[in-house]
Amino acid sequence: MNSRQQTILQMVIDQGQVSVTDLAKATGVSEVTIRQDLNTLEKLSYLRRAHGFAVSLDSDDVETRMMSNYTLKRELAEFAASLVQPGETIFIENGSSNALLARTLGEQKKNVTIITVSSYIAHLLKDAPCEVILLGGVYQKKSESMVGPLTRQCIQQVHFSKAFIGIDGWQPETGFTGRDMMRTDVVNAVLEKECEAIVLTDSSKFGAVHSYSIGPVERFNRVITDSKIRASDLMHLEHSKLTIHVVDI
């Protein structure tokens, strides 16, 4: 994917639907070129075409979400990877930032064992030198993730020193929250383990709130996010006695 196609995809993700005319104006190329780019992106399952428009895919699609704010998430992933030591066994939960963390660890050829509930992450690491343990459960097709009672049982049987977890929202009154009940249940099972729990998320999630609680906040050790986080949110997080890593973007 070239830089123009990344720009197109970002616009479509941000707006949900963008006309071919607007994409041509924004990128400075002809509508013919835009249609060629859209054909390419549709074949890669990043978006879908409608008459005269490009339309975003379902927000549960991991690959599409990973391309949203890609550069920012890549910076977060590289910082998170620096916390992982050679020979360590870690848990990486589902989600776009976590998928980039897994990819980064694979590219760095670190001798680590990665336990995950994400079949997407497992496939991403198929050629990487690290060992991958994919836990079983009920398969959520859109998120490409395992959930349910069997997944909870699997989590009880494995051990890891760090867990990297994604969130969908955070507010001072609610703490960390998720929008999927089954996924949230899996995360809470992870938090019952004796491990260092690390939130890996871009700053857009702060200020949002969803139906299902992840936590309590006191169970987490660190938060890795970007420098666009609001000062008030940062202050509240620090008052929760979390170690906050703010990556400059």
Swiss-Prot record:
Superkingdom of the organism of origin: Bacteria
Under Gene Ontology molecular function, one entry of this record is:
cis-regulatory region sequence-specific DNA binding
Tell me the keywords, alphabetical order.
DNA-binding, Transcription, Transcription regulation
Q: Which cysteines are joined by disulfide bonds?
A: none
Annotated ranges, domain HTH deoR-type:
1-56
Q: Does the keyword Ribosomal protein apply?
A: no
Q: Which PROSITE patterns match?
A: HTH_DEOR_1 (PS00894), HTH_DEOR_2 (PS51000)
Example of a GO biological process term:
DNA damage response
* Presence of keyword Metal-binding: no
The record's DNA-binding region positions are 18-37
SMART domains annotated for this entry? DeoRC (SM01134), HTH_DEOR (SM00420)
State any GO CC term. Answer: cytosol
Entries under NCBIfam families matching the protein: trans_reg_YciT (NF040887)
Q: What is this protein called?
A: Uncharacterized HTH-type transcriptional regulator YciT
Q: Write the gene name.
A: yciT
